[in-house]
Amino acid sequence: SQYQYNIPDHYDNGTFIDPGVLVDDDGRVYVYCGFLGSYMCELNGDNMYEVVDGSYQTDIIPVTETEDGFFEACSPRKVGDTYYLIYSPKIGSRLAYATSDSPTGPFTYRGYIVDNGADYPGGNNHGSICQINGQWYIFYHRMTNGSIMSRRGCVERIEILEDGTIPTVE
């Protein structure tokens, strides 16, 4: 692969914002990103900038016209043998997740973890899950002061059920 910067036709080839990185148990490194379309690739772990030939994929979370369709902000995690992608869907007040048996997908939409409601109709939500001392949490942000520029960090306990689902935080 050849690294290129500021490709003029970047919208035709994807908009690569809000990257999330997963280092798998075998040491392989995967990057997930996107805006109105999801992308992933494997990086050469020796230099961390070269894309492994043949690894680039588009629409790892299927593009849909529904409110759960991918918008931006991929955050990958591995829980047991299941790969999770937490992302901001088209309804920006929510954090959705999709799962797969492989870091390269295919990923299947599973539901919402957080819904901020009508905090700010033009805002979005970014965040991820993390296990601390055996307890799983979701870290995310909400709008405050009725402004997209005023965000406050939040954390909630979550539960990952045996079937891999994560009930929505109430």
Go through the PLM ranges and name each one.
Residues S1-E170:
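Carbohydrate-active catalytic/glycan-binding domains of CAZyme proteins
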